[in-house]
Amino acid sequence: MSQFKDKSILKSNEVPEEMFTCISGSTDTNSEMKTVISKEKNEEKSLVKTKNKVNRIRLFLNYHVKELPIMDHSIAERNSEMMKTVMRYKTSYREVTRFLIGSWLLFAEKLIPPFNMKAIIIIETDQELVDVADFEGIEILLGNNIQSCLDSFYMRFYKEDLILYNTANELLLLIDNFKIPKYFAKLDMNQVRLKKIIEKKYMSLIKAGKL
């Protein structure tokens, strides 16, 4: 049994004296040990403070909460142009859906996105997933099950969270260690209003030099 069992709960910045009674060495050794522990705690606090720095906003989705950089007007325009490019691609097959994919949808151009833009068109067929083709950056998935198509694409290409932006202007999020939710999240009116309030507050803090 530990010799610390009768001790009351230690405060976060305390080190039990017993920790040093079993260390062979001089008082200088004990002092050095305390200094090292104190330094580690300070570094830990500094790291937490850095992580908590308010440099991102929270988007509240129906199924998940995820920290995302703000998508400003210029980024929205860029995404709109890319969506028009995707929509210009013509096919005679019956489509299930088509959309853009990638975290780059919410990043400014000066930032390096985690992965490249990709457009996906899912074509309805009699089988679950029969073929995958690539046409000028547009991924064509053939299948009758949208879930199977997305599972296949997701597992083959990306190992991180995905952001989807489709033709209905829905912002979709896929997370949870490769598990794709059966129903995609969509911002409702209250969430859109909250997002605008947060963005406005965020921009005012930036202009005031507080971020």
UniProtKB/Swiss-Prot annotation:
Q: Output this protein's name.
A: Uncharacterized 25 kDa protein
Judging by the UniProt lineage, the source's domain of life is Viruses
